[in-house]
């Protein structure tokens, strides 16, 4: 499997106030084992997922949140200039940041990428991977303070060029940073 979504989490977006999680992790039930996907030894994943619920329960807003995250990473919203507003649509007019997180597997390596933001800035952003089955930080950012494990000097220079309203993952891709290349794809 080249790329596979394991889990998506959204908080404070449109009608979604508290954290909502969409997970492809299979239960321990062995009834349909032959249909499950096994990208690694640890977890079996569902090949499809259904979202169902009452009218106006937020199903479409979960999908909208996924599309907003995608738009901020690879779409037009990724090309923000300094001071430009971000596509922030919080629950009920609250002033709290919106948070998105995605756990996925790319070329056999598990990644966790997430960020929180409002209309003006990115408050928190992080990227972890599990290259040898152990969690390793690629980068994190909280209120403008960055942390890196590799290529520190190059990444510090790049982080200084990243405006408050732009995702560091997008900036690192713009500058062809090898540490974030696979996660960005």
Describe each PLM feature range:
Residues 4-68:
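Pre-Walker A-like glycine/lysine-rich segment at the N-terminus of P-loop NTPase domains
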Residues 9, 23-25, 103, 116, ...:
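Residues in well-ordered beta-strands of folded domains
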Residues 10, 104-106, 129:
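Short acidic, glycine-rich loop/turn motifs
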Residues 15, 106-110, 132:
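Glycine-centered tight beta-turn/hairpin loop motif at sheet-sheet or coil-to-beta transitions
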Residues 37-44, 48-50, 54, 63-122:
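Conserved P-loop NTP-binding catalytic core
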Residues 112-185:
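Electropositive, glycine-dotted interaction segments
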